[in-house]
């Protein structure tokens, strides 16, 4: 919930920047096949989720309202035991689902066995082509997952965990994934991989700000395209560049008071500190909002109360934020919990405090503009 992956696109360049094609086109229906073996389950053909922001996992769109990602045991434990104080700040969890790969005449499709009771409450439409075609972004991305994450070996089904799609029905979803992690968490037994992970923290804004941008996509009015920044870009920029990128994302087009966003971050931080069930070695904050088209170009950073040429706010319902990616969240009851150093138990505090302080600075700047 950190790079961005969009359907039917070229792979990002070395600078981490991708221009996204013009938005438009009809949705494709998710095909439902009769299930003769399990009366209570439906067989749904899945698509690669076009608007994945952040992470390296294979995220699939099950229906218009549901997405899923490969199941990590630590994340499954967290979602099944979310402390009440954190529930308003995490995506709606829909349980586990079995995903398998079918190949017919050289063409692959991914299928999920989903409870019919869940499907009845969901719209069975998804964006994009569900067949993993040659040259299609879905094929490139999913083949990477199959090779590097060892998914669907020997055509065996894989366990995924399923969530509500936070941007269902969005027209132009803008999203930002911020990874909170000041120090490398140490949860890797492979020495070479451990070194790479340590360098990611030491050589990025994780070490200076306590967070780094893992991915962002934002709508450009001038070009009518999405502008995308992936995790490699986020690891290559300095503190000043991060702040400028945040200023763009949380500018007036987000449709929400920056103070409100900052206060929500503070509330999330307090909720994490006050819960006693889990230790957060690393986690991500996902910010998202929808953009409406306007007739005229508007500045990116002006007082939030300003309206567009039609007297309307250009964003729908404002910017929202959720905690995501709980693979590095450890139950306090874990038998090795006592081995975790105190500075790692407080690993997200520095970053989330800095982030809210930066947004408070934006709010003060807005106040000066108004005056």
Kindly give the residue locations of the regions a language model identified.
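Polybasic, positively charged surfaces/segments
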Residues: 1-371
């Amino acid at each position: 919930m950190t790079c961005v992956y969009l359907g039917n696109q070229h792979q990002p360049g070395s600078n981490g920047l991708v221009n996204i094609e013009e938005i438009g086109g009809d949705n494709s229906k998710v095909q439902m096949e009769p299930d003769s073996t399990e009366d209570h389950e439906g067989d749904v053909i899945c698509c690669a989720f076009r608007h994945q922001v952040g992470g390296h996992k294979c995220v699939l769109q099950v229906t218009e309202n549901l997405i899923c990602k490969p199941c990590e045991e630590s994340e499954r434990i967290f979602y099944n035991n979310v402390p009440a104080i954190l529930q308003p700040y995490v995506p709606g969890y829909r349980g586990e689902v079995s995903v398998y790969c079918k190949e017919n005449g050289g063409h692959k499709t991914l299928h999920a066995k989903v409870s019919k009771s869940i499907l009845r409450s969901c719209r069975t439409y998804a964006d994009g082509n569900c067949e993993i075609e040659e040259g299609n972004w879905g094929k490139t991305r999913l083949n990477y997952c199959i090779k590097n994450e060892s998914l669907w070996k020997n055509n065996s089904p894989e366990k995924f965990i399923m969530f509500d799609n936070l941007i269902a029905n969005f027209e132009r979803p803008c999203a930002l994934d911020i990874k909170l992690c000041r120090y490398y968490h140490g949860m890797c037994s492979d020495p070479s991989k451990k070194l790479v992970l340590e360098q990611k923290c030491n050589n990025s804004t994780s070490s200076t700000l306590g967070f780094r941008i893992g991915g962002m996509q934002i709508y450009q009015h001038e070009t009518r395209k999405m502008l995308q920044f992936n995790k490699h870009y986020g690891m290559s920029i300095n503190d000043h560049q991060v702040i400028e990128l945040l200023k763009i994302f949380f500018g007036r087009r987000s449709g929400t008071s920056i103070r409100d966003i900052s206060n929500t971050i503070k509330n999330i931080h307090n909720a994490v500190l006050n819960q006693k069930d889990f230790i957060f070695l690393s986690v991500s904050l996902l910010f998202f909002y929808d953009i409406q088209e306007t007739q005229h170009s508007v500045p990116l950073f002006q007082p939030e109360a300003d309206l567009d040429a039609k007297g309307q706010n250009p964003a729908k319902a404002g910017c929202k934020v959720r905690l995501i990616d709980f693979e590095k969240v450890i139950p306090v009851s874990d038998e090795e919990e006592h081995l975790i150093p105190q500075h790692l138990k407080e690993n997200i505090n520095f970053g989330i405090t800095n982030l809210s302080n930066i947004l408070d600075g934006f709010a003060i700047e807005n106040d000066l503009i108004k005056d």
